[in-house]
Amino acid sequence: MSLYEHVFIARQDLSNAQAEGLIEHFSTVLADNGGKVVDREYWGVKTMAYKINKNRKGHYAFLKSDAPSAAVQEMERLMRLHDDVMRVLTIKVDKHAEGPSIQMQKRDERERGDRGDRSDRGDRGDRGGFRR
C-alpha cells in the first residue's frame, strides 16, 4: 500500500460538526476499501485567496492515509460527487511527517498569542521613529 496526504475544502455554511462528519465519512470510505487513515486534522474555517462556487471561506481538513490506489480513487470520486466538498487535493508521499502539520503548528502559535520576536518592545510610545 502507498502513503497519501489529502486536503479537502468543504462549504463555509456547514457547521463544525458537519465538517468533522465529512472527515469521518471519507475515513470510513478508505477503511471500507482496504485502506486506513493514519492521522486526521480539522484546520477550521479559513479565508481562501479567491472565491470557489461563490464561497470566500471554507472548512479545511487534512488526512494522512495508507491505502491502495483503488481506495484513494474511490474516496476522491465520492468527494468530487459530494455537494459539500468544493476542492480536493491528494498527493502521494514517501513517508508521513511526524507530529502535527505546519497548519496546526501555526494555529498553536497564534493561540499562544506570544510573538517571540517582539517581546523586547514596549508600547508604541517607545519607538524611535520621526516625531514633530
Swiss-Prot record:
CDD domains: bS6. Keywords: Ribonucleoprotein, Ribosomal protein, RNA-binding, rRNA-binding. GO terms for molecular function: small ribosomal subunit rRNA binding; structural constituent of ribosome. The keyword RNA-binding applies. Residues 105-132 have a biased composition (Basic and acidic residues). Residues 96-132 are annotated as: Disordered. Belongs to the bacterial ribosomal protein bS6 family. Binds together with bS18 to 16S ribosomal RNA. This is Small ribosomal subunit protein bS6. It comes from Cereibacter sphaeroides (strain ATCC 17023 / DSM 158 / JCM 6121 / CCUG 31486 / LMG 2827 / NBRC 12203 / NCIMB 8253 / ATH 2.4.1.).
